[in-house]
UniProtKB/Swiss-Prot annotation:
A Pfam short name: PsbN
Biological-process GO terms, alphabetical: photosynthesis
Name of the protein in its database record: Protein PsbN
Predominant place of localization: membrane
Role noted for this protein: May play a role in photosystem I and II biogenesis.
HAMAP family reported for this sequence: PSII_PsbN
Gene that this sequence comes from: psbN
Length: 43
């Protein structure tokens, strides 16, 4: 396997992992701990 191909696969894997973690945090069980600053703000 060429080093360039290995680098591309590694970068793609890291990008996919970061995206999956962000989606899990936004919509999964940890989303219950997120706070909306606009809802908390009193006018």
């Amino acid at each position: 396997m060429e080093p360039t191909f290995s680098l591309i696969v590694a970068i793609a894997a890291v990008t996919i992992c970061i995206t999956a973690f962000a989606i899990y945090t936004a919509f999964g069980p940890p989303s219950k701990d997120l706070q909306d600053p606009y809802e908390m703000h009193e006018d």
